[in-house]
Amino acid sequence: MERNQNPNRQPVELNRTSLYLGLLLIAVLGILFSSYFFN
């Protein structure tokens, strides 16, 4: 919505959020797969 105020800060935040979300998803998937394999 506000692209004129922080044009350089938005992409960095989006990249960081995407990276953190990816890491969280990988961690959750790893835990789920490990639980399934161990069971």
Swiss-Prot record:
InterPro entries: PSII_PsbL, PSII_PsbL_sf. It is found in: Cellular thylakoid membrane. The chain crosses the membrane at residues 18-38. One of its GO terms (cellular component) is photosystem II reaction center. Signal peptide: none annotated. Pfam families: PsbL. It is a single-pass membrane protein. Its main location: membrane. Belongs to the PsbL family. PSII is composed of 1 copy each of membrane proteins PsbA, PsbB, PsbC, PsbD, PsbE, PsbF, PsbH, PsbI, PsbJ, PsbK, PsbL, PsbM, PsbT, PsbX, PsbY, PsbZ, Psb30/Ycf12, peripheral proteins PsbO, CyanoQ (PsbQ), PsbU, PsbV and a large number of cofactors. It forms dimeric complexes. This is Photosystem II reaction center protein L.
